[in-house]
């Protein structure tokens, strides 16, 4: 997408790779919306930490980051023996896989890279194939999101108020996004609408990232408290809900997404509001048979017990926000916290799943698995 930096529009991707210094290039999302910065991560362990620490986050973005990280780790190997290289690659794979356990995109992305590497007969050949496959995954992610936009745009009519949760925009993918893709496509087709962004505590990705994206795209929006969605639905001020997913079960249609998604689905169902989930094919898990089998990441208590931000009086001129983002304890100083990062929404609460191949009912996914890149 195009980003306005110091008054100039610059096109950039959330994730990219610099082959010259074997570094993964990431937008430092923890600084947004107050500062735009691209960081270079130069080894696979650092790339795994960037995923875990949420320098980069979002299903497609961490999938592409893991794919590049696997290629990065492969390219860092200096030996010539394939047996030693295979052991090294296993270490790289497991390190990246364990960075964020709930999302399935990193595993699918790395499996795609490893499958491509098998045709190489030497270490250098496999290293080259790894980077080519990672680039292919990243480009495919963009293509999938563009297709999601085209399929989902017709759901949006002029005058609508749309609710979204967390950030499933271009920052959560390589470009374009999933939940935002229909919005961007509808905007390009001339439709005018308004978006409510849940703040999405505790990391506030809706208030910081989605709101920043929509402002960049000049789409009218308001940030709302997480608990305000029910009130707005009750008053008839929300017409449509579109969210993303970190893992969607192809066998059942259940959806794991940022904590609070299930709550919004229950509210939408109660008020008869269509609730859609937008996903690329890499987000589909064809193996698990129940949402209760999805590993739910539990993050640090500090995320719930405090908040990040900048002083309200800080100047807004270029560069003035640097190093101003700070953490403040909000909760009672002796209280602990529980911090599940995700929840699971059952299929019966979901109106449809927007995919690159079209829109399907959640329980249709298994029957359409060949069309959606699933098993035979």
Indicate where each model-derived feature is located.
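Short beta-strand segments
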Residues: 27, 65, 69, 163-167, ...
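N-terminal active-site beta-alpha-beta segment that forms phosphate/nucleotide-binding
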Residues: 53-224
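Positively charged, low-complexity intrinsically disordered leader regions
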Residues: 1-45, 52
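Conserved phosphate- and dinucleotide-binding cores of soluble alpha/beta proteins
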Residues: 192-193, 198-376
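Short, hydrophobic/aliphatic alpha-helical segments
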Residues: 39-55, 154-162, 246, 323-336
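A short, flexible beta-alpha/helix-coil linker loop
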Residues: 31-33, 70, 169-170, 247-250
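PLP-dependent amino-acid enzyme catalytic core
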Residues: 25, 31, 37-47, 77-95, ...
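Short, glycine-rich nucleotide/cofactor-binding loops
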Residues: 38-44, 169-173, 250-256
């Amino acid at each position: 997408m195009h980003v306005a930096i110091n008054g100039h529009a610059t096109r950039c991707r959330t994730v990219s790779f610099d082959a010259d210094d074997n570094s993964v290039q990431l937008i430092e999302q923890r600084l947004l919306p107050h500062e735009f910065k691209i960081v270079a991560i130069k080894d696979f362990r650092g790339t795994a930490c960037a995923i875990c620490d949420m320098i980069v986050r979002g299903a497609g973005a961490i999938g592409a980051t893991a794919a590049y990280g696997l290629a990065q780790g492969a390219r860092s190997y200096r030996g010539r023996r394939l047996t030693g290289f295979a052991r090294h690659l296993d270490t790289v794979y497991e390190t990246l896989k364990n960075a964020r356990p709930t999302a399935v995109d990193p595993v699918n992305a790395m499996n795609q890279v490893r499958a491509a590497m098998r045709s190489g007969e030497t270490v250098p050949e496999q290293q080259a194939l790894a980077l080519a496959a990672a680039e292919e995954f990243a480009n495919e992610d963009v293509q999938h999101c563009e297709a999601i936009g085209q399929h989902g745009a017709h759901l949006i009519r002029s005058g609508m108020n749309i609710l979204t949760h967390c950030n499933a925009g271009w920052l959560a993918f390589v470009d374009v996004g999933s939940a935002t893709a229909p919005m961007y496509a509808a905007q390009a087709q001339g439709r005018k609408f308004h978006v409510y962004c849940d703040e999405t505590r505790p990391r506030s990705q809706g208030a910081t990232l989605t709101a920043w994206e929509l402002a960049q795209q000049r789409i009218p929006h308001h940030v709302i408290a997480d608990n305000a969605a029910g009130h707005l639905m009750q008053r008839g001020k929300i017409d449509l809900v579109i969210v993303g997913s970190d893992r969607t079960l192809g066998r059942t249609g259940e959806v794991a997404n940022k904590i609070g998604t299930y709550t919004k689905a229950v509210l939408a169902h109660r008020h008869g509001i269509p609730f859609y989930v937008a996903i690329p094919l890499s987000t589909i898990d064809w193996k698990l048979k129940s949402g209760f089998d999805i590993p739910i990441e539990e993050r640090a208590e500090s995320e719930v017990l405090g908040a990040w931000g900048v002083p309200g009086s800080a100047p807004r001129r270029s560069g003035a926000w640097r190093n101003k983002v700070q953490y403040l304890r909000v909760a009672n100083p002796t209280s602990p916290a529980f911090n599940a990062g995700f929840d699971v929404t059952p299929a019966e609460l979901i109106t449809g799943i927007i995919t690159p191949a079209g829109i399907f009912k959640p329980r249709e996914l298994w029957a359409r698995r060949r069309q959606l890149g699933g098993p035979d």
